[in-house]
Amino acid sequence: MKEYRTITKIAGPLVFVEKTEPIGYQELVNIVLSDGTIKRGQVLDTSDDLVVVQIFETTTGIGRDSGVRFTGETIKMPVGREMLGRILSGGGKPIDGGPEIVPEKRLDITGAAINPWARNSPSDFIQTGISTIDGTNTLVRGQKLPIFSGAGLPHNNVALQIARQAKVPGSTESFAVVFAAMGITKEEANYFMQDFERTGALEHAVVFLNLADDPAVERIITPRLALTTAEYLAFELGMHVLVILTDMTNYCEALRQIGAAREEVPGRRGYPGYMYTDLACIYERAGIIKGQKGSVTQIPILTMPGDDITHPIPDLTGYITEGQIVVNRELHRKGIYPPINVLPSLSRLMNLGIGKGHTREDHKKVSDQMYAGYAEGNDLRGLVAIVGKDALSERDRGLLEFADLFEDKFVRQGYDEDRTIEDTLDLGWDLLSTLPVEQLTRIDRDLINKYHPKLKAGAKKE
């Protein structure tokens, strides 16, 4: 262990130390104060004669005469089966009043990118119990599908509902949820803990909570701790793991804060130029590995500043991930929960996990027809505001009514309502039955005869 007393500068969470020997990147550091207190940090940058250390807590009490000890080790996450059912801080320490976790292994939190050749193509449907996701923007095991939200919208409720209800229908394989919250208030943290305990979802979950008043540096390691835990459960214990990360905007703000303290040249809107690479290091840790039983599926959640989908955070996230679920303020104002707008939403891997052998043979066609009907009906609302409803044709009035029914019956559902994929598709058929059969141009005739409620009822009478 190397020790120096050569602190030259302290800026925010960063401590600058002169050194004479080589120091490794991301090496753990112990800073000993004059009263014997030890503060922990990590090497953020190293050059020929200077090391930048980021402190995992406040820099209060650190002086030029404080001892700086370089341990020669990187951050490792203690992992084990005992983690299931536990609530941990953003730094990986138990905060639920339970005993310390006895680790089976200690793993480097940086992880490693999955070799593209070793990746298996995602193909298994994950049922979230939310119709707007399962029916029209299906989540597939091994996918990374973000939720784009805005300040004040109920994305945390959606996250908790997914964490509680997510499952692979008909599968007997072990399923777990790793939930990591970053930059949340104490009120939100209490709400998360109470909801997990009330619903019993905590039994198969590991929860990490980083509070808003915790150091920004801790916010940087929280998602990495969560993903290291998920990779252990998936690839060493053979479990299928869903990782929910909220709120990635707070994570990116922490990146910007640390970048400013390091006096880096800023990129777009003040965010570091390497933010794309940094986010990719997190998102790309999802997937399925050939020959391995487990999988890691990711749902990162972020709030778009000013509801701007072109902001660097959602913009870069969209480049890396495989689609997006968009939470809409207008639907929220109408009192609709979950306020998910299916029109700008997209799941790029949806077609790999639906259809015969996965969900149901009519899934793709029903989804396409509902999307087309809702899109046209939604466009007609703008026309009605100009010319009035009476000026519409009978066909247009039917589509306008379909758009209202779609929001009220399909999009709207209860916080504790867990719909099966059969419930979702049957509900879709009920809505489509309000339109004339000849307008269902995106559905094959044999599927209409088999699933259309009115035609099914007629066939039974005969």
From Swiss-Prot:
One of its GO terms (molecular function) is proton-transporting ATP synthase activity, rotational mechanism. It comes from Methanoregula boonei (strain DSM 21154 / JCM 14090 / 6A8). Has multiple subunits with at least A(3), B(3), C, D, E, F, H, I and proteolipid K(x). Belongs to the ATPase alpha/beta chains family. It is found in: Cell membrane. One of its GO terms (biological process) is proton motive force-driven plasma membrane ATP synthesis. One of its GO terms (cellular component) is proton-transporting two-sector ATPase complex, catalytic domain. The keyword Flavoprotein does not apply. It is a peripheral membrane protein. Keywords: ATP synthesis, Cell membrane, Hydrogen ion transport, Ion transport, Membrane, Transport. This is A-type ATP synthase subunit B. PROSITE patterns: ATPASE_ALPHA_BETA (PS00152). Component of the A-type ATP synthase that produces ATP from ADP in the presence of a proton gradient across the membrane. The B chain is a regulatory subunit.
